[in-house]
A protein has these predicted regions:
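HIT superfamily nucleotide-processing domains
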Residues: 1-132
Length: 132
């Protein structure tokens, strides 16, 4: 996609601090990191949301993220992937953030459970199993 910033990074039209590349994926340092070592791993295949991505590309991304996490030698890290504007996706191209977490750096999460009960959860599980 010609207007996509990540597609332009992959093509070399926009420079990046490339770390790793395969036939299917590209990994580079985030230019606005939350912590030292904050990396983005993106598919070369353009897709806006994860469920639109091929299984091969998705597998490749996760293997690369694992390889980079091991190379960074960080004990704690987050893998973050957002889908859609309401989920805080800013660039409409699938991307996985690998964010090393230290005491003073990294991703901060405010987790607010919506409340539920086991009957509701079991009903939801039954309905979803039928679709899988």
């Amino acid at each position: 996609m010609t207007s996509c910033i990540f597609c332009k990074i992959i093509s070399g039209e926009i420079p990046s601090a490339k770390l790793y590349e395969t036939a299917k994926s590209y990994a580079f340092f985030d230019i606005d990191p939350l912590s030292k070592g904050h990396v983005l791993v993106i598919p070369k295949e353009h897709a806006e949301k994860m469920h639109q991505l091929s299984d091969d590309s998705l597998t490749d991304i996760l293997v690369i993220a694992k390889k980079i996490a091991l190379a960074l030698k960080v004990e704690n890290y987050n893998i973050l992937q957002n889908n859609g504007a309401l989920a805080h996706q800013v660039v409409p191209h699938v991307h996985f953030h690998l964010i090393p977490k230290t005491k003073n750096e990294g991703l901060g999460i405010g987790w607010k459970p919506i409340g539920s009960n086991i009957e509701e959860i079991n009903k939801q599980a039954e309905e979803l199993r039928k679709l899988l």
